[in-house]
Amino acid sequence: MNLAVRFRSAVSLLGRFPALAGVDLDVARGEVVLVRGPNGAGKTTLLRACAGLVGISSGEADVLGHDLRADRRAVRRRVGLLGHAAFLYDDLTVADNLRFAARASGSSKAAAEAASARLGLDGRLRDLPAAKLSAGQRRRVALAAVVARQPDLWLLDEPHAGLDAAGRDLLDDLVREAAAAGATVLLASHELDRASALATRSVVVAGGRIRDGLLTPSPAPEPPPTEREHVHVA
């Protein structure tokens, strides 16, 4: 199997707290995997670890053929992360934020322009500094930044949050198109009906571990809440 993500007994410590407490996970290239679980289960940490933003303390963790314990920088260039908060450079315009995202991943200016057009970020909006955007606009620009990176691995944390109906439909289209083009997608969501329609399979995270990796996309009861989330997504 050609794997995009391979974790074996992977542990990630935040201080003394094991946010990931021995994760075993295989994700094949081209899969769309729904990551489910209660708040504080470790979903956000798992996605951030896959993005090379959270260190692996022990165990094995390979993403896109790179060892996360040795080469996180190479991983960061090939992934796109949409977190809870829409991280943008507030002093840059929308257009410059997208160009920066494309350049940071080795993508092209044309990719940034295409992402801007696809997300409807044209006209006066392109020239606004990110600091002047509404919450919904920031979310759309952050999604466009992921698209501009042309990532091999999409990491989407509650991706539908903050988008209007048209934006949510567009996001679904983008996920399907990315998977059809060979990209891999991990999305964490509480909107099970919508997210399950996108996913090829789902996994449940609870207590920092994968509890069940064999679920069908059909929603099932969530595990009971555990510890609160200890990670802030930027």
What are the residue ranges of the model-derived segments?
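Helix-to-loop junction immediately C-terminal to a conserved catalytic motif
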Residues: 51
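Conserved ABC transporter NBD signature motif
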Residues: 59-67, 75
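Conserved ABC ATPase "signature" region
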Residues: 99, 109-125
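Conserved ABC ATPase signature
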Residues: 129-133
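ABC ATPase C-loop
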Residues: 146-147
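Catalytic Walker B motif of ABC-type/P-loop ATPase nucleotide-binding domains
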Residues: 154-157
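H-loop/switch region of ABC-family ATPase nucleotide-binding domains
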Residues: 189-190
